[in-house]
């Protein structure tokens, strides 16, 4: 049998532009048809005419009887079948090459327009037309070709023709040979003088190969039908998706990341929405705060306020025993909008401002001891 490498290379290029069913079909075609046909089947039918014998000495009788029994050799019949079922796939490959050629032209045109755009010329409309053509041809980013539009129709037509050819060759084989071979063939044809019996070489072995090729043809036909339904439903799904989201083919912008807000601490216990309140009080000092989930921070009750001031007074007395002087500016009261009694007591209070960014590291012992010492710039009461 001839060299199948040229056809194999062409069909191998279709792998990158086929569905999963198409890749399986090509694997079946290569392994169970072309490979088997070029090795075992050809050797089994190599002596079919030379080993065909009839019980007559009439010249030419064996030739006419062989021609009547086998109008075409099984091997040549299967070669024709492989060629016919491969032609639609090759036509689809030609369409893919056409789309790739179009892609090269569109990319070249797009680069030229971008160069002109850098000079200040408005070419947005032309660029949009190029993007529309790429989407129409099924061209995506990085040179990837997607089945869409005319390419999808060509693929569906190729599957239909492959299925039709499979069925047609199965019917022709059944009509000419059947799916089994007999050991004896009866022939009555000129120039045979009478009805003669002719004998076939290795009929059982040939019958096994015939049945095997029949099964492979049925499997290929089933794969074509499954792939046809898959591509059909995939096309319907893409069409529905395109109607719901007509701009799905364009690149989507990635959402910008939210910048984290700085970590501020407040005298009244409120903290920034994204950062927890940093520890601001000395050791042993408790500050009862309200619920931080409330953004207004106005839900503090009177008991919490009294507890805060009691803790603060106790700490002030303890620090006073150590000989430190506390600045009056540090003893500002808390400002509550809904506590009128507290605002009357703390008439000297001012609106509290948020501190700057708080260092998350805990204060060292040296710094805590140094903070209790009086400084020259402290205001004395």
UniProtKB/Swiss-Prot annotation:
Signal peptide: none annotated. It holds the Pfam family Connexin. Residues 361-373 have a biased composition (Low complexity). Residues 338-381 are annotated as: Disordered. Residues 2-23, 98-163, 229-381 are cytoplasmic. It is found in: Cell membrane; Cell junction, Gap junction. Keywords: Cell junction, Cell membrane, Disulfide bond, Gap junction, Membrane, Transmembrane, Transmembrane helix. Belongs to the connexin family. Alpha-type (group II) subfamily. One gap junction consists of a cluster of closely packed pairs of transmembrane channels, the connexons, through which materials of low MW diffuse from one cell to a neighboring cell. Plays an essential role in gap junction communication in the ventricles. A connexon is composed of a hexamer of connexins. Interacts with TMEM65. This is Gap junction alpha-1 protein. It comes from Gallus gallus.
């Amino acid at each position: 049998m001839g060299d199948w490498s040229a056809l194999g290379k062409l069909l191998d290029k279709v792998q990158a532009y086929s569905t999963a069913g198409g890749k399986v079909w090509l694997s079946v075609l290569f392994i169970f048809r072309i490979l088997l046909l070029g090795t075992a089947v050809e050797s089994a039918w190599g002596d079919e005419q030379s080993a065909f014998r009839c019980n007559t000495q009439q010249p030419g009788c064996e030739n006419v009887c062989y021609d009547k029994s086998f109008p075409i050799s099984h091997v040549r019949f299967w070669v024709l079948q492989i060629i016919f079922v491969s032609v639609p796939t090759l036509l689809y490959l030609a369409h893919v090459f056409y789309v790739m050629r179009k892609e090269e032209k569109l990319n070249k045109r797009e680069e030229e327009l971008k160069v002109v755009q850098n000079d200040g010329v408005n070419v947005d409309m032309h660029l949009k037309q190029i993007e529309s053509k790429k989407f129409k041809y099924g061209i995506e980013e990085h040179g990837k070709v997607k089945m869409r539009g005319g390419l999808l129709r060509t693929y569906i037509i190729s599957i239909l023709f492959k299925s039709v050819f499979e069925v047609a060759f199965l019917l022709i084989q059944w009509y000419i040979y059947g799916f089994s071979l007999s050991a004896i063939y009866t022939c009555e044809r000129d120039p045979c003088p009478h009805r003669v019996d002719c004998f076939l070489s290795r009929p059982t072995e040939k019958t096994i190969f015939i049945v095997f090729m029949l099964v492979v043809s049925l499997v290929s036909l089933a794969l074509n039908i499954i792939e046809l339904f898959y591509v059909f439903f995939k096309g319907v799904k893409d069409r529905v998706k395109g109607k719901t989201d007509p701009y799905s083919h364009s690149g989507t912008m990635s959402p910008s990341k939210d910048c984290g807000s700085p970590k501020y601490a407040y005298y009244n216990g409120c903290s920034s929405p994204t950062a927890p309140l940093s520890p601001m009080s000395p050791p042993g000092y408790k500050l009862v705060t309200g619920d931080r989930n409330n953004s207004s921070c106005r839900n503090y009750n009177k008991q919490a306020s009294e507890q805060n001031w009691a803790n603060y007074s106790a700490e002030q007395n303890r620090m006073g025993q150590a000989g430190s002087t506390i600045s009056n500016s540090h003893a500002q009261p808390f400002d509550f909008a809904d506590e009128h009694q507290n605002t009357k007591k703390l008439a000297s209070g001012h609106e509290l401002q948020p501190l700057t960014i708080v260092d998350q590291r805990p204060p060292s012992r040296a710094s805590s001891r140094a903070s209790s010492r009086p400084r020259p710039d402290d205001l004395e009461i």
